[in-house]
Amino acid sequence: QIGNHIFDMVDAVAAKEQKKALDYYYDLLTLKEPPMRILYLLTRQFRILMEVKEMDRTGVPPKEIAAKVGIMPFLVGKYRTQAKAFTRKELRGIVEAGVQTEEDVKTGKMGDILSVELFLVQYSSKREK
């Protein structure tokens, strides 16, 4: 269940559907999922997208992509689709922001619930043209 919510949350971020991304987050909080676990899973998901995008760009076959990133082969297509919504630079920035957000919480600079909220708001906002 949490995996589906995380995947859906990333879809919402990719589509710049901020309300939907936050709704999934609040659903997970209601289900008593710790904010830091949610952040970890989101960051992991974006890291996988970054790896899939890079391997896809260099022509790595789907089965090999699945083996290298640790996902089921039938999921490669879904990850490719999600990855297309982002540039490599955006994915790298999101992963770095996830790591920084986790550090900010662990060092007491930010509260856990708010920090994940801000992370989602930042990356699900409409892009400036």
Predicted regions and their residues:
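Small-residue-rich helix-loop
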Residues: 1-90, 127-128
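Residues within well-formed alpha-helices
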Residues: 20, 97-100, 123
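Acidic-residue sensor for enzyme active/binding pockets
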Residues: 33, 102, 117
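Generic structural concept
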Residues: 39, 43-46, 95, 99, ...
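Short, charged, intrinsically disordered terminal tails
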Residues: 109-129
